Amino acid sequence: MHNNNRIVITPGEPAGVGPDLVAALAQQDWPVELVVCADPALLLERARQLDLPLQLRTYQPQQPAQPQRAGTLTVLPVATAHPVVAGELNVGNSAYVVETLARACDGCLNGEFAALITGPVNKGVINDAGVPFIGHTEFFADRSGCDRVVMMLATEELRVALATTHLPLLAVPGAITRQSLHEVIRILDHDLKTKFGLAQPQIYVCGLNPHAGEGGHMGREEIDTIIPALDELRAEGITLIGPLPADTLFQPKYLQHADAVLAMYHDQGLPVLKYQGFGRAVNITLGLPFIRTSVDHGTALELAGTGTADAGSFKTALNLAIKMIINCNE
């Protein structure tokens, strides 16, 4: 286990289900200290609404970390600017959301925390406040000074990484270059080894076009870009299979051998993974100088404060982060 034995959590949008799920996480023992970067009053009020017992302890960075006991959380206080009503967005609290992300990220960068787990945010309301925000992945990459990070979603049975993330489909072909594939695949291979404990990961790669281009008859990106890039990376010792047509690759005879699949764009790979394991999937940012996992769902405003939100994805994200910490220290 990591020396500091602490994991920092950002609940995300205060009006969404993030605070509910954090309160639910607190209902069991954990082998690490859970430091929640949030408004203490928000956490206590949401726990009261859900009729969940919760005691808060103020984060003391100079004290040794302690395993988290059921019914308790450690809190790193950040105040909301306006009162929070479950289910009702308030643009005035957008700066609060960004502040929690910044503080948690900085704590990971300076070694306070072994990992960061994020709850869902509402990108629209943050941008409405005049704060440019594409997403967690891009925010943490920029704050960490990383030129390239990789988005990967994982269930127990399948890991899918993305060569491109939040781009319009029209922009995807131009964003896939030999250089970008080199960077993405090197990060993917490195983190599968160091954070997932895989000695020689097998990475299966999707083509961009239908039928992986059909020998150039349905697009030349495979011939001109993807195949040469994969050949160059194979020469470095990375195990790569493909490019294969996506509708072929996502079949058991291939997936049973795959440690990870690299999809060329967001909606090529993620629908399959989410159909297979929605609510059990974890979003992981590879290439950061720290471990970051997240839930695979949104803010679910209509469920906030009702007691009906499922904490399964949050628990899975936390358990995976703990496993990754152990792998990094072996």
Curated annotation (Swiss-Prot):
Biological function:
Catalyzes the NAD(P)-dependent oxidation of 4-(phosphooxy)-L-threonine (HTP) into 2-amino-3-oxo-4-(phosphooxy)butyric acid which spontaneously decarboxylates to form 3-amino-2-oxopropyl phosphate (AHAP).
Q: Which cofactor does it need?
A: Zn(2+); Mg(2+); Co(2+)
Record family assignment = Belongs to the PdxA family.
Keyword Translocase annotated: no
SUPFAM superfamilies for the chain = Isocitrate/Isopropylmalate dehydrogenase-like
Reported EC number(s) for this entry are 1.1.1.262
**Record flagged with keyword Oxidoreductase:** yes
Q: Which miscellaneous remark does the UniProt record hold?
A: The active site is located at the dimer interface.
Q: Which GO terms describe its cellular component?
A: cytoplasm
Q: Which domain of life is it from?
A: Bacteria
Organism field: Serratia proteamaculans (strain 568)
Q: Which UniProt keywords apply?
A: Cobalt, Cytoplasm, Magnesium, Metal-binding, NAD, NADP, Oxidoreductase, Pyridoxine biosynthesis, Zinc
PANTHER family noted in UniProt:
4-HYDROXYTHREONINE-4-PHOSPHATE DEHYDROGENASE
Q: Pathway it belongs to?
A: Cofactor biosynthesis; pyridoxine 5'-phosphate biosynthesis; pyridoxine 5'-phosphate from D-erythrose 4-phosphate: step 4/5
Q: Which GO terms describe its molecular function?
A: 4-hydroxythreonine-4-phosphate dehydrogenase activity; cobalt ion binding; magnesium ion binding; NAD binding; zinc ion binding
Name of the protein described by the UniProt record:
4-hydroxythreonine-4-phosphate dehydrogenase
Where do the annotations place a divalent metal cation binding? Answer: 166, 211, 266
Q: Which GO terms describe its biological process?
A: pyridoxal phosphate biosynthetic process; pyridoxine biosynthetic process
State how it assembles: Homodimer.
Cross-referenced InterPro entries = PdxA, PdxA_fam
